[in-house]
Amino acid sequence: MEGTSRALSYGFEVGDMVWGKVKSHPWWPGHIFNEAFASSSVRRTRREGHVLVAFFGDSSYGWFDPAELIPFDANFEEKSQQTNSRTFIRAVEEATDEASRRSALSLACKCRSKFNIQPANEAGYFAVDVPDYEPGGVYSVNQIIKARDGFKPGEALAFVKQLAAGPHGCDQNGLEFIKNRARVSAFRKAVFEEFDETYAQAFGVHSSRPLNDTSKVSKQLAKEPTRGIGLFVFP
């Protein structure tokens, strides 16, 4: 599609988190939405050469020329402080939560449960259950690969050491801190062993290794991503 091609020419991909400006509103956090997941009524409003952006906080959306968008991460510090309105703060909180989940996505796999990652209804997309986040988040193969490439063991270890040496010396509201914290937490859950064999042997505890509970399967393989769109439209 022409809109997607233009997005690529500006360094964006479908799924990328961005800031978009609408008339008198402040720059608002959102993400470039795959048109395949949109309703027919939304697709009918499509504008040539534009991409569909779903915004956080108020379920609004709009068609944007990629030239009108700016990257989410690089502009977070400035744009997240624009106003104290409750609606805007809620949108930033939702966007920050999504950025955290995408960071934790790097450690999602079928190691513990084969149901963690399931094919979505759109080719090339998967519904992923990331621990501590809303289940059934839908991501493309490229997004999952990008998330995994973003996990650097050495950097994660350096982050933990930095926290241990000076827990109050970090900007805990900064986006990088939030994303690093999500990765470390996800790693902790990925390697956590409920059954400690060494402990059991040392203290003579006769407990059995728990079996994976396959009954806790996410029944919500959404037809569209959890961040839905469609209540309001910006021209």
Regions inferred by a protein language model and the residue ranges of each:
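Acidic, Ser/Thr/Pro-rich intrinsically disordered low-complexity regulatory segments
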Residues: 1-4, 218
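Short beta-strand-centered aromatic/proline hotspots
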Residues: 27-35
